[in-house]
Amino acid sequence: MSKRLLLAGMIACCLAMPVVILAADKPPKKGASVKAVKAMSVQEQTALALSAAPPHISKDAGVMVFGEDGKLTEARKSANGFTCIPTVMNLPAPDPMCMDAAVQQWVTDLTNNAPKPTNTVPGIAYMARGGSHFEKGGQVVMSGEGAKNVSEPPHWMLMWPFDAAGTKLPIAPNPSGVYIMFEGTPYAHLMVYQDPRKMK
């Protein structure tokens, strides 16, 4: 499964390093570039990656970090089916994500421009530091061309083909904290604006 995460960087160990963990708990530096994340040590990248998930997930999760060649490589094997990476879009700050095997497949399919995701079960992904998405004309879109970048709060995702017509769920961020991202595409999925760090 780790090979699937060598997917163009998805742009798309720290249990023995408490000092590094504390550093990763600080707010991410605004304007940080992917290059800056890649320049971090393995320990720093590991701490950043693991900060994406609830403690009961991150403690046994695998970790992928950027190597000297700029590609993601396995730094720690997963003992619970989840794998964490130090950043995704990095706009405007590091946005680590921790995902299960189904989401890894989903991401691989998206990166490879597959017609639709091929995961056969719903996938779960955590982004406890928040992230960002593109909006154009008041709608969340997949491409950044001509769109504005909008920051997102801490959240988790359910990668499964949700349909707004059938579920009656919103298709844009709203006060309820739940919406379908990429509605109308095969990659539609559920966004839940709930802080993973508060999950027990």
In which residue ranges do the predicted regions lie?
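Bacterial N-terminal signal peptides that target proteins for export
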Residues: 1-10
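Bacterial N-terminal signal peptides
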Residues: 9-18
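Sec/Tat signal peptide C-region and signal peptidase I cleavage site
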Residues: 19-23
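Primary mode marks residue(s) on the alpha4-beta5-alpha5 output face of response regulator receiver
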Residues: 26-200
